[in-house]
Amino acid sequence: MVDTKNPGDKTLSVSPSKTLTLKRGVEQGTVRQSFSHGRTKQVVVEKRGKRRVGGDGPADAPAAPAPVAAAKPAPVRAPMSRPPQSSHRGGGSGVVLRTLTEDERTARASALADARIRDEEERKAAEAELARRNSKEGIEQAEREAAEARKKAEEERHRQDEEAKRKAELEAKKRFGEEEAKKAAAAAPAKTTAATTATAAKPGAPARAPGVAADATDEDEGPRQIRRGPGGAARPVVAPKPTAKPAPAKQRGRLTLVTALSADDVRERSIASFRRRTQRLKGHQSNEPKEKLVREVIIPEAITIQELANRMAERAVDVIRMLMKQGQMVKITDVIDADTAQLIAEELGHSVKRVAASDVEEGLFDIVDDATDTEPRSPVVTVMGHVDHGKTSLLDALRHANVVSGEAGGITQHIGAYQVTSPESGKKITFIDTPGHAAFTAMRARGAKVTDIVVLVVAADDGVMPQTIEAINHAKAAKVPVIVAINKIDKQDAKPERVRTELLQYGIQVESLGGDVVDVEVSAKNKTNLDKLLEMIALQAELLDLKTNTERPAEGTVIEAKLDRGRGPVATVLVQRGTLRVGDIIVAGAEMGRVRALISDQGVTLTEAGPSVPVEVLGFNGPPEAGDRMAVVDSEARARQVTSYRAHQKREKSASAVSGLRGSLEQMMSQLKTTGRKDFPLIIKADVAGSLEAILGSLEKLGTDEVTARILHAGVGGISESDVTLAEGFNAAIIGFNVRAHKEAAAAAKRNGIEIRYYNIIYDLVDDVKKAMSGLLAPTLRETMLGNALILEVFNISKVGKVAGCRVTDGSVERGANVRLIRDNVVVHEGKLSTLKRFKDEVKEVQSGQECGMAFENYGDMRAGDIIECYRVETIQRSL
């Protein structure tokens, strides 16, 4: 702006009414600096305004040495020591700075207030940021930000490295130029001085006032405007670039939240260095001798080399090397026996514990009870004897029941268990009824094993019979006392004394003959002396002192088992020790289950069954075999272990038996060629396991060298469609004992022509199978001699052929009979007579002494003097 009143005055003014005055050169204020991670700091800031120096063009000449003064920082604070009245000097000096107007002061105060408010907000935001970082979400956010910061720092480091590399190249070029300059300076020192001065202060640099610092406007961004006098053009001067800062040290160690928030940049050990140190320490430790670890190695009956090495924590190569020293060439997967494994383990310094697969059954049975916890129990009495000697009738009389009428054919074919209460003592007695037939030997043996007392029933009119002797042997094998009950004394031909005498031959000496065996004469029909029999049983039980613990887990024996279509597998169990309760987990043979229901012999549902109580148990997975021992286990896992072991043993046993019987294919074919043995295929289904066992035993006895009964499948339960399919494949017959075929199975059998036979008496079944097997036997051929004839002359007839004229020398000759042609006592032909004529008539028979003509079928080599022997062959059917 130009003042029209004073054209020569260069003083700036805002309005014509006011003159500009020079304000104090230094202004003080406070500024709050913000650092990373929420740190702030309040500092005092001094601001120096720019001084404008007016005048003509020549006035700039004295200001030329200003750069030399600008390099000294001492005169920076010189204006502060000036008195305030220096600003009121006359305008003759020509230098007057403008003062701020009221609007500018207001705007400046408002800007400072806004800056303070902004600083306060930034401080609060930093505190909130710090609190957020301390929280869980803040920590995660901080980790992400730290990762971004690491990325940016890495990029910045790369950029600075590139910048440093570029500057190093420039510096090298500069040094090369300085060396050239030094060479030139040796020739022209004045020129070098001028060059140095020109380098320190470029020509045309702005003149600075003595009181203004050289870096007063270093913070200003952008080019500075410098006046060069009236009429001088202002040109921008670019600020010198700051020198490159050294690249920050490489971040070492893992960057965590703590290191990211820490203010100090601490140099730490790198992760790679730490890992190298750890590896060195491990290497030193591996060189040290290790202490041998002695382990307890569990060795089963058979074990692989790999498994043995794993259990010993040894290398399998070492185990193989030891075996090779013993002369055994083995692989890592080979199986060795327990003795070899024990030798290897002991040689390597380990202790050995031998186990067997049968160890799973340890603690299952025969647990010794404490004598203080035992209580008296009821005796178990087994009634044994020959068939039709009145065993079941005697039990019916004791139980006041009628079981005999329910048995097919009036004979007992099932083993039964019942409880009877003694009328005098009120104590219960458990009776087991066994079949007396020869087929039920296994049932009688089972009854003898679980019993305490054996009642041997002998008919007074029949005496000792084969099954009576067998029952005596079972009782002796079980080492149980015997009470002889001589039944049917009501008959007229009863001879009790003969029975007592016959028993002496088999080691049974009754008390009346000086022995210790009790005998009672009873009559089941008239109920004679039944109370005396019960009294003798109770007395014998007192002598045995039968006691057991009722609170222990139950043990027992499966008397009988069957597969009921409505109830599933049902087992008749005699509890021998402990108490069996509903819900117990039980194991019997290869079958397991949980007790769902307990049913007494009277059909009453029970919640528990104590010792000597026979019950039907529902809940098995499958029907167990009769005679299996039953036990209660603590868990299903233990039950599965026991049953899997028993099933494995059962499979191995059956496989070995089958392989032993079958042999090789060549042996079987040669046997068929030599013996011509035939099989009679059968599928047998029975109601209970005991009956099935008796049937199989009886059929095995029917086999001979020529024919045998081949049992394709035998099981408990009804006849199913799978049985019919199996029978169709092998052309077998199906036999059902006290069972029936399902509706679908019966229809399939009728459609495919499969024969199904039903039986309820075991002897009828055995007899029919015996007849059918007899039909497979080759019949017996028997020759009957008829007579001999001598050939007198041989005639050749064109229509008939050669005809021999003969005389019957012995017996008779019949047409159609078998003949032999004997020449010189050698049979040269066997065949049949085709023609027998006497004179010209065909006759059926020619008697001795008569002449006749005979011709053979398909044979004509006959000569005079040959003898014709005539005989008849009879076929006789064989039977087993």
From Swiss-Prot:
Q: Where is this region: G5?
A: 523-525
- Which gene underlies this protein? infB
Domain called tr-type G: residue spans: 376-547
Residue ranges for the region (G3) are 433-436
Region: G1, residue numbers: 385-392
Q: Which organism is it from?
A: Rhodopseudomonas palustris (strain BisB18)
Return the PANTHER family for the record: TR-TYPE G DOMAIN-CONTAINING PROTEIN, TRANSLATION INITIATION FACTOR IF-2-RELATED
The segments labelled G2 in the record are 410-414
Tell me which InterPro entries the record gives.
EF-G-like_DII, EFTu-like_2, IF2_assoc_dom_bac, IF2_II, IF2_N, P-loop_NTPase, Small_GTP-bd, T_Tr_GTP-bd_dom
Q: Which SUPFAM superfamilies match?
A: Initiation factor IF2/eIF5b, domain 3, P-loop containing nucleoside triphosphate hydrolases, Translation proteins
Basic and acidic residues bias locations: 115-183
Gene3D superfamilies recorded = P-loop containing nucleotide triphosphate hydrolases, Translation factors, Translation initiation factor IF- 2, domain 3
Q: Where is this region: G4?
A: 487-490
Could you identify this protein by its name? Translation initiation factor IF-2
Binding residues for GTP, per the UniProt record? 385-392, 433-437, 487-490
The entry's function note states: One of the essential components for the initiation of protein synthesis. Protects formylmethionyl-tRNA from spontaneous hydrolysis and promotes its binding to the 30S ribosomal subunits. Also involved in the hydrolysis of GTP during the formation of the 70S ribosomal complex.
Q: Which HAMAP family match?
A: IF_2_B (MF_00100_B)
Question: What ranges does the record list as Low complexity composition bias?
Answer: 58-79, 184-215, 233-250
A single GO molecular-function term is: guanosine tetraphosphate binding
> Keywords on this record?
Cytoplasm, GTP-binding, Initiation factor, Nucleotide-binding, Protein biosynthesis
According to the UniProt record, where is the region Disordered? 1-251
Protein family membership: Belongs to the TRAFAC class translation factor GTPase superfamily. Classic translation factor GTPase family. IF-2 subfamily.
Q: Where does this one sit in the cell? A: Cytoplasm
Residues that span the membrane, as ranges: none
Instruction: Identify the GO cellular component terms for this protein.
Output: cytosol
